[in-house]
From Swiss-Prot:
Taxonomic superkingdom: Eukaryota
Organism for this UniProt entry: Tremella mesenterica
Modified residues (Cysteine methyl ester): 12
Subcellular locations according to the entry: Cell membrane
Name recorded for this polypeptide: Tremerogen A-10
Keywords attached to this entry: Cell membrane, Lipoprotein, Membrane, Methylation, Pheromone, Prenylation
Origin organism lineage: Eukaryota, Fungi, Dikarya, Basidiomycota, Agaricomycotina
Membrane keyword on record: yes
Primary residence: membrane
């Protein structure tokens, strides 16, 4: 899963 709280997440 993609964790938006984790650093390095280029999630727009």
């Amino acid at each position: 899963e993609h964790d938006p709280s984790a650093p390095g997440n280029g999630y727009c």
